[in-house]
From Swiss-Prot:
InterPro entries: Ribosome_modulation_factor, RMF_sf. Keywords: Cytoplasm, Translation regulation. During stationary phase, converts 70S ribosomes to an inactive dimeric form (100S ribosomes). GO terms for biological process: regulation of translation. It comes from Xenorhabdus nematophila (strain ATCC 19061 / DSM 3370 / CCUG 14189 / LMG 1036 / NCIMB 9965 / AN6). Pfam families: RMF (PF04957). Signal peptide: none annotated. The lineage of its organism: Bacteria, Pseudomonadati, Pseudomonadota, Gammaproteobacteria, Enterobacterales. It is found in: Cytoplasm. This is Ribosome modulation factor. Belongs to the ribosome modulation factor family. GO terms for cellular component: cytoplasm. Gene3D superfamilies: ribosome modulation factor like domain. The gene is rmf.
Amino acid sequence: MKRQKRDRLARALSRGYHAGILGRPRENCPYHSLDARSYWLGGWRQAKEDRV
């Protein structure tokens, strides 16, 4: 069970990173659960830093 949860969160992180690299706004986050949303936003923020 923990492995599946971790995989889901890792996927949210990588999708957020990809969205940030493409320059999409953070309001486009597709996740509604707090955990997945925070991972997506973390990836998005990291991508924004990497683009600079």
